[in-house]
């Protein structure tokens, strides 16, 4: 019987200090997340310098807690992995440096993981999804449609050319006075509104174009709010939230389903913070069913940034013998499919 492979994964690319221990790429032994949301909320977004300092304060405790929950010592871990990009350079350096230091001190293999690869790998946790499939990765910093040929082998079919989906959620939520983070705030408000109330524009909707542009709909919402204010008319923020959410979700789902049909695959998945949106999941299930597509998505705890997804992604590098050197540096604008290991 093959030996179990246990990997410690560390994630600090933005404002979550996270560590998780995963066995064989699927079984989560622990997943500890220290969120900085309450710290950044008053600024309406993540402040990189503050995020870096908070990561430094929390990283050792979070890693120790992850090992304790897994009931393992560092000596019992087969490899250590950490995100090295994309993300904010200061936060990335905290987790990357800590992970490399642990690996060096214990003589363990080290694996640098692409953050987007981690989000895709979250779909493997506790489930039976196997490549090939098409995955939508949508979060505050990323919006990609990725054809997953095999574990760790990708073709980017489309990406955002300006604002990411989650970024648009944050900016519109701020304009509506709904607070930060915008995704959950918009989703909550949308449940009280009429999604057909306002028709906002959609970009790049022609067939075969899998790229995104969300700056247009964001600007359209801001212009609508300004016009209503100038006319002295009351704004129904719930209708605006619902109409905006419908716009974003319809674009995401249309392009994902179309990309899957283009690649002639029978499976689609979603990942990233936006993947926890209930309306997105509902709409995808409905549209995918029309074309006989199976839908997969991670548990919501694995949609946000977490260490378990980094450990899961690293497992597939481990079995291929693909390790990183101690000279691996943070790459803030790392693209999926690129490797600097």
UniProtKB/Swiss-Prot annotation:
Keywords: Acyltransferase, Cytoplasm, Iron, Metal-binding, Transferase, tRNA processing. Binds 1 Fe(2+) ion per subunit. The keyword Acyltransferase applies. Fe cation binds at residues 115, 119, 305. It is found in: Cytoplasm. It comes from the Bacteria. It is an enzyme of class 2 (transferase). Substrate binds at residues 137-141, 170, 183, 277. Pfam families: TsaD. One of its GO terms (molecular function) is iron ion binding. One of its GO terms (biological process) is tRNA threonylcarbamoyladenosine modification. Its cofactor is Fe(2+). One of its GO terms (cellular component) is cytoplasm. CDD domains: ASKHA_NBD_TsaD_bac. It catalyses: L-threonylcarbamoyladenylate + adenosine(37) in tRNA = N(6)-L-threonylcarbamoyladenosine(37) in tRNA + AMP + H(+). Its EC number is 2.3.1.234. InterPro entries: ATPase_NBD, Gcp-like_dom, KAE1/TsaD, TsaD. Gene3D superfamilies: 3.30.420.40. Belongs to the KAE1 / TsaD family. Required for the formation of a threonylcarbamoyl group on adenosine at position 37 (t(6)A37) in tRNAs that read codons beginning with adenine. Is involved in the transfer of the threonylcarbamoyl moiety of threonylcarbamoyl-AMP (TC-AMP) to the N6 group of A37, together with TsaE and TsaB. TsaD likely plays a direct catalytic role in this reaction. This is tRNA N6-adenosine threonylcarbamoyltransferase. The gene is tsaD.
